[in-house]
């Protein structure tokens, strides 16, 4: 990795209903781990807000943006998100609001 490319970070901002927060935490604590062996993956942190109702953060570190994008199109991505996607689908099929919503932003690391 060159000095010009210190890495890439994706931050997923996940809002959960109060009733779903515990389930969200359990999903990550018992995650499949499929991401751990993918090319370019460095590590991940899952952060719980100190203020109830604020967003959880899932911060993943990658060698390159291309590595991150390859993961989002992989079987490992589908496997790693299957249980959460099923929870959202179940709520929508029942005419309910989803128990969690998410959005993400990406960043280039400029200094260590």
Please describe what each predicted stretch is.
Residues 37-41, 63-102:
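An amphipathic, aromatic/His-enriched active-site/gating alpha helix that lines ligand/cofactor pockets
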Residues 9-14, 45-76, 80:
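Short, well-ordered beta-strand segments in beta-rich or mixed alpha/beta enzyme
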Residues 7, 35-38, 55:
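A generic structural signal for ordered secondary structure
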